[in-house]
Amino acid sequence: MSEHKKSSKIIGIDLGTTNSCVSVMEGGQAKVITSSEGTRTTPSIVAFKGSETLVGIPAKRQAVTNPEKTLASTKRFIGRKYSEVESEIKTVPYKVTSGSNGDAVFQVEGKQYTPEEIGAHILMKMKETAEAYLGETITEAVITVPAYFNDSQRASTKDAGRIAGLDVKRIIPEPTAAALAYGIDKAGDKKIAVFDLGGGTFDISILEIGDGVFEVLSTNGDTHLGGDDFDEVIIKWMIEEFQKQEGIDLGKDNMALQRLKDAAEKAKIELSGMSSTEINQPFITMDANGPKHLTLTLTRAHFEKLASNLIERTKAPCIKALADAKLSASDIDDVLLVGGMSRMPAVQEIVKDIFGKEPNKGVNPDEVVAIGAAIQGGVLGGEVKDVLLLDVIPLSLGIETLGGVMTPLVERNTTIPTQKKQIFSTAADNQPAVTIVVLQGERPMAKDNKEIGRFDLTDIPPAPRGHPQIEVTFDIDANGILHVSAKDAASGREQKIRIEASSGLKEDEIQRMIRDAEQNKEEDKKRREASDVRNEADSMIFRAEKAINDYKANIPESLVKEIEERVEKVRSALKEDASTEKIKEASEELSRHMQKIGEAMQSQSASAAPSSAANAQGGPNINTEDLKKHSFSTKPPAGNSTSASSNNENIEEADVEIVDKPND
């Protein structure tokens, strides 16, 4: 396959909990790119099946029969400690354990995978989708994250991009991306709220937009609330109902649980447009009396009752976001709905209650975030002019000071990029060193906030307590990722760190994963080529047998025998699971003999030409041009899988004509 030239495009990727989407700027417009499966979004699912790694739709298709090795909703674990994901672990069929640094990692067949690695597989799929469409190699991307993702989660998402072979030019919040897509062609000043209820997280952002400036005024949310939780209440209800009917607990059967998960997701979607839905799962389990079937009716009203607590949880973050923006609901001009769960009528109703107006349903909640990311990519690449994005940090950042107190340096909803400095001192006489503990959160005591990093400033000259002047600087870049430094004024000694996050990957781990991803890419390519060769060989057997059947009476018996022998050689090579090279050799040999059919037919046609009587007496009316086309198309691809695919298309067209024309 010829190498693509490097693209100047910066693609936009919405790396979602349930589905992912990729978009690119073309002719001044953001375009969502359709996947190789023909869909505009791709399931954020990775599965391991033997030596294969499946991503997207193929992974989703086999989830029911392979639940422990199918990793879905992994975004809920990225950048998090094992101790932080207790509720999420209960909802997935695969094994989640604690990694060497306490991070949540996935255990599949004795091997550990980090959420960053799994995210990288999905990002690679998005990258390949864009490359197939553009015909160019993509190296740069803007990736979106929930607005309420903390520093660890943002840094880990960026690491996933690096593992996927992408230079992540910017990490931007999903609601901000949605606002970009909505407001890029709007005139006048507006204050908007973006209500984003996705598969794994909930965000609310308040923005002011006008004259190409998109300023985030405040953001809030809940990273433990999303569509998965709505699925879970339906699953729990189905398990309870089935136990009442049959006395069997389906919650202990992983395969049944995966089927219930699929059924719950389908029912949830249907209830957005219908008042009730039938849930049918035949042969869901069996007991001593035989197979058992699950048949239930779920009404929209009952679903809303089951999910009422989840819906109610969206209210408080909205009220806080309005208060932080110093606005009332009446100040909001428009409310955008983003994320698949925003289609639920009860969710739309609570949005109407909070903001006092009908939400705007004019954007596609599944695609608008990727479109906004592509627009931001266009801004960074110089393709989109006169757009300025002013984002904020979602949570306060500070350090631990005397008495275990959290002292904020950067308050939540501060516009980024930003730099803040503050002078601190020692707590004891002649203190030689200080430990800077970096915290993120809103609680007054350090222990109640999330520690995202720590480092020591040593060799402080002896001095009474309170005398040393230690300047602590917090520098936050446009991605919302933090850099911290501490400098002793007396000695000039300075120590600084980029907060990699206490949850996150070290540089050597990232490099190893990049190498693994590249190696897997090569192995996947080899597997694909082997599959193409086998498919071509199988197809050639069919065409050879068909040609013999169609033209046996018009070609020498010796040639028929030779072709039949070559067919058996190819068939044996396939059955014996021979190497790709051996199958290719056998196929090429069969191809050479297949061409002799065309030559024999041409020769016979030429010798029969002087006599028209043959045709009058019922001789075969054969179009030799079709035979030429047929024999030429059977030549195996002289190279890679791309040409194999191309040849297959020609073969199918030729076959259609050959079947019809001898009977004309």
Curated annotation (Swiss-Prot):
Source organism superkingdom: Bacteria
Pfam families, per database record: HSP70 (PF00012)
Entry-linked CDD domains: ASKHA_NBD_HSP70_DnaK-like (cd10234)
GO molecular function: ATP binding; ATP-dependent protein folding chaperone; unfolded protein binding
Bias-annotated ranges (Low complexity): 600-617
Family: Belongs to the heat shock protein 70 family.
Name of protein: Chaperone protein DnaK
Organism for this UniProt entry: Chlamydia felis (strain Fe/C-56)
Gene: dnaK
